[in-house]
């Protein structure tokens, strides 16, 4: 058995965000400095995973709610964009690199999750191809920099889960969500609209296309704020909104439902909403971003 430490490189640095540590640090600081911390300490956040030029300022609204003084483990749940996956997958590395500093995977928690038999392992190739987890690493590193040697991460790639699987994984993760020293980061963009996404829902009563998209997204966001996994599934079945992190969101909502059964009182609020551009005709396309935080009362 070799004790060689295996690292996942910051494969999207230099394209989706800058590979320069000082420049990245300055950008993240700039976005975070423009935001209020109102929902601190967040127990979970939902934030986007696009290139930082598109969604960096939106994501700051979620990361500003993270309290580094109490957070010791960060679960990052991201959807799989490239490989078909019907369950959830764990990384096969020890370290996730970022241009700021390296993040350590919590092998103890990984061991607990692996023992359930509910997970598979992703290859290094799959890990480095996927951006849904990586885009949260620089923000995680920045939010936690005052306690950078005192926390670990638990990256989880979430497959195209059935509703019953979302319930099972929600139940499993609920015991971790109950712990105030854990933070859940749920990685999701919202509507992907336009011909290139093969999605062009339009409610003309809303006026311009971008207003219809916003109305559709905010309908989904308000269901998430009600913390109701069944209504969220029904909304997706009815409108087919292209929310790429629908399964990680479903897992979070089911974990919350499990804790509410045990009398835990929580609330979720979205704090920011943005679109990559404003669609006005059928040739246009856009991606929507939303940032929000879950707090425990």
Swiss-Prot record:
Record field: transmembrane: none
Consequence of substituting residue 81 to A: Abolishes interaction with ERBB2
Record InterPro entries: MEMO1_fam
Keywords of the record: Phosphoprotein
Phenotype when changing residue 244 to A: Abolishes interaction with ERBB2
Pfam families cross-referenced by the UniProt entry: Memo
UniProt key word Phosphoprotein: yes
Lineage, top ranks: Eukaryota, Metazoa, Chordata, Craniata, Vertebrata
Record-given protein name: Protein MEMO1
NCBIfam families listed in its UniProt record: AmmeMemoSam_B (TIGR04336)
GO terms for cellular component: cytosol; nucleus
A single BP term in Gene Ontology: regulation of microtubule-based process
PANTHER family in the record: PROTEIN MEMO1 (PTHR11060:SF0)
UniProt gene name: MEMO1
Subunit description: Interacts with ERBB2 phosphorylated on 'Tyr-1248'.
Modified residues (Phosphotyrosine): 210
Phenotypic consequence of residue 16 to A: Abolishes interaction with ERBB2
The species this protein was found in: Homo sapiens (Human)
Family label: Belongs to the MEMO1 family.
Record note on what altering residue 49 to A does: Abolishes interaction with ERBB2
Described function: May control cell migration by relaying extracellular chemotactic signals to the microtubule cytoskeleton. Mediator of ERBB2 signaling. The MEMO1-RHOA-DIAPH1 signaling pathway plays an important role in ERBB2-dependent stabilization of microtubules at the cell cortex. It controls the localization of APC and CLASP2 to the cell membrane, via the regulation of GSK3B activity. In turn, membrane-bound APC allows the localization of the MACF1 to the cell membrane, which is required for microtubule capture and stabilization. Is required for breast carcinoma cell migration.
């Amino acid at each position: 058995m070799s004790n060689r430490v295996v690292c996942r490189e910051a494969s999207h640095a230099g394209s989706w965000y800058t590979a320069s540590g000082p420049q990245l640090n300055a950008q993240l600081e700039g976005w975070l400095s423009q935001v209020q911390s109102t929902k601190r300490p967040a127990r979970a956040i939902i934030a986007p995973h696009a290139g930082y030029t598109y969604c960096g300022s939106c994501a700051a609204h979620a990361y500003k709610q993270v309290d580094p003084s109490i957070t010791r483990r960060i679960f990052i749940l991201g959807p799989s964009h490239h490989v078909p996956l019907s369950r959830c997958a764990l990384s096969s590395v020890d370290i996730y690199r970022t241009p700021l500093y390296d993040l350590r995977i919590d092998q103890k928690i990984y061991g607990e999750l692996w023992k359930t038999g509910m997970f598979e392992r992703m290859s290094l190739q799959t890990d480095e191809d996927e951006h849904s987890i990586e885009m949260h690493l620089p923000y995680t590193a920045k939010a936690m920099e005052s306690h950078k040697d005192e926390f670990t991460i638990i990256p989880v790639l979430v497959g195209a889960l059935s509703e019953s699987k979302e319930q099972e994984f929600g139940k499993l993760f609920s015991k971790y969500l109950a712990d105030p020293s854990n933070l859940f980061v749920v990685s999701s963009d919202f509507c992907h609209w336009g011909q290139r996404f093969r999605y062009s829902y339009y409610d003309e009563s809303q006026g311009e296309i971008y207003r219809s998209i916003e109305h559709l997204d905010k309908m989904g966001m308000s269901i998430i704020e009600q913390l109701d996994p069944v209504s969220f599934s029904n909304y997706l079945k009815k409108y087919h909104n292209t929310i790429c992190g629908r399964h990680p969101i479903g897992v979070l909502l089911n974990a919350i439902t499990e804790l509410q059964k045990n009398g835990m009182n929580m609330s979720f609020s979205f704090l920011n909403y943005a679109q990559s551009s404003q669609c006005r005709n059928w040739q246009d396309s856009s991606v929507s971003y939303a940032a929000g935080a879950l707090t425990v009362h």
